[in-house]
């Protein structure tokens, strides 16, 4: 999300937006947050201002569409920016620094401190400062690109009409040629466990705890569970994650990577109970919570007591009170809006992107869909290869992957070869004393084409983008191995793994 903001700000300062050629109507001059007696006329109305919605709105305006973005919350940016990706990364980053200083890491580097104290209020303040700057950045981009921001709960009240209802009951009608639904997702509730965002919390509450709990239980060891569990474990909590599946890291992660990832997290002090289900939770008179668990296949019950219970069992599409039923748009069995390859619903001028449609619930996937969708409205080509959408877990070390896992290739009967390179053999990782993990490359046996990349280690989230580029343009393992990579860098491990996949041997391992 930050990268888009920087690009747009940079382009705007240089005046590029004014030079974009198009054959459409001029941009809207309606001021932001307008509430008028008369309807607003628009070419495109976007409902939701998360990563998919705000990027789509800006792109639509750049293409010459008169654009309105309706957002129910006071701040722009959706879940990702306000209570998701952005604040969690601030806490992950700062808790990692604290963990390094508080443990033996700094001392081993010759940095000695007599006393290290945690100021949780200050840490939360830094998180909020980052969020505020980025939400304000989107508002600035809307103004710069002449996107009309209407604050209110958007409902589709006709195939060419959206009505926004604000908190005081006032309404604004938007008459529009096209409607783009980008309302995102919400936390999936756990049956029988009531979230109070105090001691029984969702990911939202876990980002704003007032103190470090002595003991925390996390339901779910997927991406969100291990990220937020890591934050509080680093800050001093005794954290146990209970996971129904037999591995950590969620859906799509390569099993070899998952096992190594779990081992590293356990070494840091994170505890796991895999193949285990939560059957209930009871709040006691002393404020503590008894969490009942048993084997996923059934068996003897066990109780774990904690101060904070974090529920992280996933997210579900948010389509509440959108007016879909009245329009005859039915949801699929998983609550998603069915769309075609151009992101059109059964009503051709009503589109949907992001978490409300099929595919991974990722901010960058929503961004891509938003851009491609509005380009399609303007007559452009519409194409997205979901196999090239990367996934990242922002723990330390990071985990990132794109393309197929070994398990998927075996299931699909595709013959493949494997190239691996450990960070322990990478010079930059050695100098940084940060050598856990490896790069694993999967290439097609017959063609050498890259089929998947799986990275566990420092900087994995940045490195995976090189793999995504390779997959998007059909590169071979040899193609990557022959690209000169700067030395000493962590990305040399990526080159070496591709060399091992293509040639059978790496140079430095």
Curated annotation (Swiss-Prot):
Residue numbers carrying N6-acetyllysine: 66, 104, 122, 132, 143, 346, 410, 417, 420, 505
Reactions mediated catalytically: N(6)-[(R)-dihydrolipoyl]-L-lysyl-[protein] + NAD(+) = N(6)-[(R)-lipoyl]-L-lysyl-[protein] + NADH + H(+)
A single BP term in Gene Ontology: 2-oxoglutarate metabolic process
SUPFAM superfamilies listed in its UniProt record: FAD/NAD(P)-binding domain (SSF51905), FAD/NAD-linked reductases, dimerisation (C-terminal) domain (SSF55424)
Keyword Transferase recorded: no
Subunit structure as annotated in this protein's UniProt entry: Homodimer. Part of the multimeric pyruvate dehydrogenase complex that contains multiple copies of pyruvate dehydrogenase (subunits PDHA (PDHA1 or PDHA2) and PDHB, E1), dihydrolipoamide acetyltransferase (DLAT, E2) and lipoamide dehydrogenase (DLD, E3). These subunits are bound to an inner core composed of about 48 DLAT and 12 PDHX molecules (by non covalent bonds). The 2-oxoglutarate dehydrogenase complex is composed of OGDH (2-oxoglutarate dehydrogenase; E1), DLST (dihydrolipoamide succinyltransferase; E2), DLD (dihydrolipoamide dehydrogenase; E3) and the assembly factor KGD4.
Protein name, UniProt field: Dihydrolipoyl dehydrogenase, mitochondrial
